Structures are given as C-alpha cells and as structure tokens.
Amino acid sequence: MSEFTVRGRFPARYGEQNFEKNVEAPNEDVAQERVYANFGSQHGLKRTQITIDEVDA
C-alpha cells in the first residue's frame, strides 16, 4: 500500500476549515473513501459537505 496525502476543506462553525490527511491505501479512490469515512465518523459530516481538492501519492 502507498501513502497518499489528501487535501481539502469542510464546513466549520465560522466558515470553512482546510485539512490535510495522510492515509495508507492501495489507490487514490480508496484514499478518498477513507477520508470521507473518517470525517463522517469523527465530525458527523456527510460526503457532500466534504470537498477534496487534491490527492498526492
């Protein structure tokens, strides 16, 4: 598995909050899915509320 850096933003109390997460995944699509799942469980956000701008290997 490779390590991917996923950058994006999500709505916070006062505007948008930028984020950068490092995740291990076999490909970029799985890395995005893991970020969606992580933010959904930790912050209670829906997938449509999370904007992923960039995925780097």
From Swiss-Prot:
<keyword id="KW-0689">Ribosomal protein</keyword>
<dbReference type="GO" id="GO:0005840">
    <property type="term" value="C:ribosome"/>
</dbReference>
<dbReference type="Pfam" id="PF01775">
    <property type="entry name" value="Ribosomal_L18A"/>
</dbReference>
<comment type="subunit">
    <text>Part of the 50S ribosomal subunit. Binds 23S rRNA.</text>
</comment>
<keyword id="KW-0699">rRNA-binding</keyword>
<comment type="similarity">
    <text>Belongs to the eukaryotic ribosomal protein eL20 family.</text>
</comment>
<dbReference type="GO" id="GO:0003735">
    <property type="term" value="F:structural constituent of ribosome"/>
</dbReference>
<dbReference type="InterPro" id="IPR028877">
    <property type="entry name" value="Ribosomal_eL20"/>
</dbReference>
<dbReference type="GO" id="GO:0070180">
    <property type="term" value="F:large ribosomal subunit rRNA binding"/>
</dbReference>
<dbReference type="GO" id="GO:0006412">
    <property type="term" value="P:translation"/>
</dbReference>
<keyword id="KW-0687">Ribonucleoprotein</keyword>
<dbReference type="GO" id="GO:1990904">
    <property type="term" value="C:ribonucleoprotein complex"/>
</dbReference>
<protein>
    <recommendedName>
        <fullName>Large ribosomal subunit protein eL20</fullName>
    </recommendedName>
</protein>
<keyword id="KW-0694">RNA-binding</keyword>
<dbReference type="InterPro" id="IPR023573">
    <property type="entry name" value="Ribosomal_eL20_dom"/>
</dbReference>
